[in-house]
Amino acid sequence: MAALMTRRFAQIPEITKLMEECQSMGIKTLGPDVNESYRVFGVNEHGEIRFGLSAIKGMGAPAADAIVAERLKNGPYKSIFDFAERVDYSSVNRKAFETLALSGGFDSFGIRREQFFGKNNKGETFLDTLVRYGQLFQQEQHEAANSLFGGTEAIEIATPPIPDAESWSTIERLNRERELVGIYLSAHPLDEYSIILNSLCNTHCSELGDKQELAKKEDVVLGGIITGVRSKFTKTGKPCGFVTLEDFEGSGELALFGEDWGKWRGIM
């Protein structure tokens, strides 16, 4: 499955379907991690699929390759500051740092994602000061190596403080993650409702397109989170809507017409 994802890593919708299939089969799919992910999708020692760095939306292959190459050459990144000190800035820019922070690529360092966007008393985000710190560290390191003393002294530059930041809501954090990796990986917005959904629902959202199976049921009960709404008009010019619902097993689309669409469109 990891190999199939790799072949389609440029097709986010296809990857999303494959990851949903993995989840339904009980195969754990983990988000990106700078200390375990490779450029493409892979399988870790526990048999879990690890998201490939270059499959993150907005993360280029050169940045992914540079991160992995440095890790393989000099060992795992010990902290976010160690990462900033070692990464190749000719390939890994600020946008790559931001993408990794939002997608969970830095989660293993124990820093909450929102803290990367917290500001100091100068109005600078931790993300900006972190990148600047790393670039300055490497500049000083280069100058020391080319000095008369041969760079024998350790580089001493103060690391930027990690700010406190107001916690994002679970849905905000997960939505930002989903925008970049195509699926909820670290958690699911419906986790706290899992017992209710499993007890009451007899249909998964992914089954909405199977009209024959739905017709066999006396009642159709399902639950999920709305992830998309499209407004359209019928051939006769009447308004209608198509709502994308997602649960733990996948997603499906529900069509609403007439009074139903008029009743619900204002709150979706």
Label the model's feature ranges:
Residues 1-268:
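Noncatalytic, beta-rich nucleic-acid-contacting surfaces in large DNA/RNA-processing enzymes
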